[in-house]
Amino acid sequence: MLSKIKALTLLGLLFLIGCGEKEDIVPGVRLDLRSSIDAPVLASKNLTLSKVKINKNWTHRNGSQSHYIEHPALSGLPVEIWSEKIGVGNKKRQRLSADPIIAKNRIFTLDSNFGVTAFDTKGSKVWTADLTSTKSPKDKISGGGLAYSNDSLAVSTGAGEVVLLDAMTGNVLWRHDVQGSISAPPTYSNGMIVVMTGGSQAIALNAQNGRVVWTQESNTTGAGILGAGTPAISGNLVILPFTSGEVLAVSLDSGLQSWSQVINGKRVGSANGYVKAVSGDPVIVGKTVYAGTNSGRLAAIDIKSGMRVWTKKEGAIGPVWISNNALFVLTDQQKLKRLDRKNGAEVWTYDLPIYKNPKRSTGKFGHFSPVLAGNKLYVAGTDKKIRVFDPKTGELLNLIPLRGGAASQLAIANERMYILSGAGKLIAFQ
């Protein structure tokens, strides 16, 4: 009986289907509703680098107060020519955080115990200055950095002090307590020194006397990191990178805000994805600001309006390097990438080693932001190597041995390359 009912039901369904009207096929292009709203962006693979120039100075991280410098000259494959101890290197509780600064044939360094040293180009010590105090005792606190302008050297310390030194003698001109920690270098331009504190505050000091001119705070808070982003200055405009992921544009002389932009987003599945800090120092090139976070975002921002030009789902460790239509970046996932500067599209990528033992994920390596010099791209790593790449294709060309491993970004001046090792040595290459 049941089988007859099933058969009749099936026949009825077939009858109804047969009686249905034919579906009208609407003409036009079919689009997949499941496709991403992010349209694919095409990258220009053509590469036109800036003209190679001999630069005499390297006054800030990435070369200048704007964190942009034109293509430095560097001939052949550099080899080590000398190395000298700068003081205390990396220790269990203390880390080197200051890149070498170069000006007027002097190389300035800061060790992990707040010792500042000036070297000449032959590696001889010119002077040393011990900046430890009751506020910054030895063997307990590290962090900070260096910046040069107007024959003086600005030093920030992890203890929250800003000290101005005579660059020729090392004499202390003044010191100021900002009442907060400082883990990143200062930015020094037009008679003003700007620092970022760990409490999401920017402080501008008059270089003549060390007095506070203005302060700015982020609207939100975030976790800081050692050697975090530093302000970028172009003319009378300062770009402030906060640990909250906010980027603020203000006037250098008054601190008056022009615009604010928050670089939102996080790297899913990574603990670093929750650290929103702008770790990719703002870089000012022409009418655009480039900045990246530790949580997987990189943005190009219009310098006048503060509106985003493009956003890339890639973080940045340290400043990007710009050369004409190319943007080179070390991402938060330890990948070296070349992007199209105009739209952020990827041209090539190179996976840098992360672990000494990849199978067990032990012995973690770190790498520092790329530097373009002499038509080659250089990346220094804690794995005791400086990698040399073809900037057009991303091909690994050479490996330069680096005793002690890298503890800073490379600095280049007068066709020489300088770097700090984890053992606390300044090493020169040519």
Explain the meaning of each model-derived region.
Residues 55-56, 104-105, 150-151, 190-191, ...:
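Short coil/turn segments that connect the beta-strands within blades of beta-propeller domains
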Residues 82-101, 128-147, 174-189, 212-234, ...:
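Extracytoplasmic beta-rich repeat domains
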Residues 120-124, 166-169, 206-210, 252-255, ...:
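Short loop/turn segments that connect beta-strands within beta-propeller blades
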